[in-house]
Amino acid sequence: MFTAVSVSTRGCATTRPISLARGARSNARARAAPRAMANVDEQKVVVVGGSGFVGSRVCARLRERGCAVTSVSKSGASVEGASSAIGVDLADAASARDALRDAFAGAECVVSCVGVIGTDDAKMRAGNGDYNVVVVEAAKAAGVRRFVYVSVASVVPDVVGGVAMKGYFEGKTMAEDAIRANFDANEYVIVKPSFIYGGDAFSLTPPRVTKTYGDALAKVLGSGPVKALAAKAPGPIALTLAEPVSVDDVAGACVAGALGMTDGESVVDGTDEIKAFAKKL
């Protein structure tokens, strides 16, 4: 079952570098002119998991870029920045496929922030794997041109995948495999964060710290000496010393991918790559 709300259409601006005469380039750099807005098209983007921690921020950032945003979630709750909200239960695969195909009609990109953590392996495998496979296949069937997915940094399963949360990592792998099977490398972006922080509240499930605390932690763990130590440390220690990533940077990377600002990149793995990718906006 799903409930649809009408979608309003707004133009979504993408960007490209400005071509400058050779003699004027240094002056343009000195002025630090903003990137020019170009290729203005009416662009619909659907965010699955749009009411969640990451998804809600993706919706807001897309709206800032002028996109017509549809949020899909189990509850169908309205989300700031989304011009429509649709309720879809991904656990009911048959009805979800039909609902998603309708929701994805006319969309330029689908962003999946769907993920489940803190339950048993079977539920985590389904919530991260099966649910996303349904989303990917529905996007392909609807003729969506680009797909963005929030997965997990490769360093995390490499360290703890055989010890805990096996179903979580298996599900993430299922989702990534489905994306690669249905979309070409220049049609998708997989964003792979480790520990995401942000917001105003602490949480245990999923584990999360506030923006203030996370910014301070990122400043320490992102310093040169700590990064150098982490690079030489064995897996568990390296993961402990890994710099966390702000939810705003994760959302920014998703939006850059959704708008096709990829420069040929299809996998954005870890905090450094995510921060650099988010700066494309």
Q: Where are these predicted regions, by residue range?
A:
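N-terminal chloroplast transit peptides
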Residues: 1-28
